[in-house]
Amino acid sequence: MTEIGKTAMETRPSVYILGAGMAGLAAAVRADKLGLRPHLFEATSHAGGRCRSFFEPGLDRTIDNGAHLLLGGNTGLFTYLSEVGAQDSLKPMDPVQFPFLDVASGLRWNLQPSAGRLPWWLLVPGRRVPGGRLSDYLAMARLARLDPNATDSPLTDFLDRSAPMFARFWQPLARAVLNTEAEDASAALIGRMLGETFLKGAEASRPYLAPAGLSQALVDPGVTHLAAIGQPPSFAARIKALIFDGTCVSGIETDSGTVAIADGAVISALPPGEAQRLIPGLEAPDQFNAIVNVHYRLEQADNAHRFLGLIGSAAHWVFTKGDVVS
């Protein structure tokens, strides 16, 4: 960064962002694009939170800290990638399809949304869930009209749990999107996801994978961008406390000292428990579901980078990349 650029950055209004997971990283990048000066604090030694890659000596391979399947309708993600110059870091899957296997029966099928907003694929048995009725799919439109701020009803309030669609589509969808069983999943949040993906057609539903790993595809470009503008994240900077002046934050106390805030905004991109610890009176979720990822190394590499949804299995998804199955 040139001295002129450094001076210009220092004159910008500041915004202080707590947590350098993907939310915090994206907030810092967007703040820069809006003409603000982002100050990003992270307690650990890396950005990205749980969205990252690491070298596993037992496999002698770099693996992702959890399997992530990204869809074309995630406009926030692709805007972020464009802002950091990493538009080509993800691999689009072609054709647009979601392969499934019912482990108990051996039945296989591909969910294949059609191009455009007219969902003619629902009329083609070979492109939809076996045993599904057209009326089952009407629930998608009903859910997409729900307001997340007006209803907290579970997904099952809108579904026929005895229909084949429940086990073969709705339950896997709830687990994949919200990491929650359909009985507890927010109907409105699932509806919003459907409205931004499947109900918009094939391009918005297109799966994307990260061939080089999550860190290289999503995290490193953001960190590099912030470093290039002279505002790299502050790592190993755990927030010990927030200092309040009434309802405004006037200081951020870290392990290395206190950062005074004369003006500017503070954004919390922290996990719920940490945010609750720092912000008096904040109500936050206190129930969570763990995700277990198991990685295997194959004797022979599979050159395809692909995935498979499993029904009636202890494992829900299988991803292959090179000679590693996750």
Q: Over which residues does each language-model region extend?
A:
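Glycine-rich FAD pyrophosphate-binding loop
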Residues: D32-P57
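N-terminal Rossmann-like FAD-binding beta1-loop-alpha1 element of flavoenzymes
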Residues: P13-L40
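Helical element adjacent to the flavin cofactor pocket in flavoenzyme catalytic cores
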Residues: M193-D255
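Conserved Rossmann-like nucleotide-cofactor binding loop
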Residues: A23, H46, G273
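A short, basic/flexible loop-to-alpha-helix module at the beginning of a structural domain
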Residues: M1-T11
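Glycine-rich active-site loop/strand segments that organize a redox cofactor
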Residues: G49-G73, M140-A144
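Mid-domain catalytic core of redox enzymes
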Residues: L34, A237-S326
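Mobile amphipathic helical/loop "lid" adjacent to a hydrophobic cofactor/ligand pocket
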Residues: N74-F78, S82-G191, A204
